[in-house]
Amino acid sequence: MNEPQYHSLPDELSVLVSQHWMHFVESGHRIPDALLADLPRVWAGSDYVAAQFQRDPGLGEWLLASDLSQALAASSLKEEIRTLLAQCDSEDDLKRALRRLRHRHMVRIVWRDLARIGDYHSAVADLSLLADTLIDEALSVLYGWACERSGAPLDPDGNPVRLVVLAMGKLGAHELNLSSDIDLIFAYEHEGEIEGERRALTHHQFFVRLGQQLIKALDQTTADGFVFRVDMRLRPWGKSGVLAIGFDAMEGYYETQGREWERYALIKMRPMAGDLQAGDRLIKRLNPFVYRRY
C-alpha cells in the first residue's frame, strides 16, 4: 500500500495527517490507491473521516465503488439500505446497521465536499436524502415488527394505517447540514383499536410505541454512535404534547391554538417517511391555517 503525499500540506496539518495515517496503518486496514490523491486534503479537514477509516476495514473499497463523481441516487440508496436492514432480526441489529450506513455515507458526503468533487448544494441535498431514506426504511422494519406483535391498525375500510413522519426545519427544507438535529412530528390518519389476544390496543398507543422505538433506533448513543439527534418539540403542545397525534386532533389544535410562529414553522413541513400519501392529505388539511386568507 502506497503512502499519501501529505508533506505538501502546511506543517501543522502535515503532522496531523501523518498521525492519522500512522494509526490507520497500525489498524491493519488498507485503502485503494485511487483515493490517496485526495486523502491528505480530506483527512486534514475531518478527524471524523480519518477515524472512520480506522474503524471500518471495508470503508475504502466501499467508498471507491460508490462512484464519488456522482451525488446520491435515491433508488440505489433505498436498495442498499433496504437490503442491509432486511438482514436485521432485532432492534440491536437494526441500530448497528443504521449506524454503519450513516457513518459510511457521511464519510462519502464529507469526502466529496472536501475533495471539491461536489458543492455545498449537493452536500445538503445528499444529507437530506440520506436522512429521509434511513428513517423511512427503519420505520418500515419497526412497523412490520410491531404488526407481528400486536396486529396491524386498520382504517374503517380495513386498510392498514401507517405512521406519517413529518420533517420540519432544515430537514423539511432539504437543507440538513452535518451537525443538524432533525425536527420531526409523528401523525396518523385514523383512530381505532387493534383487537389483540389479551386486550385491545388503540391506534394512539400503537403509534406512540412505534414512535418511541424509531427515536431510540435513531437517537440512542451506542458503541457505534448515533444516527441523528431527534427533536420532537415542534409537535402540537411541544414537549407536553402526545408523541403521535391523529389528523383530526392535529387539525383541531392548529385551528384553535396554533400560534404565529407555528404557522411559519409549518411552511417547511413535508411528509418524509411512512405513509406519504396520507401525509399529503394532512398538508392539504393544514394549509388553511398556514396560508390564511385575510
Per-segment meaning from a language model:
Residues 1-294:
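A nucleotide- and high-energy phosphate-metabolite-utilizing enzyme signature
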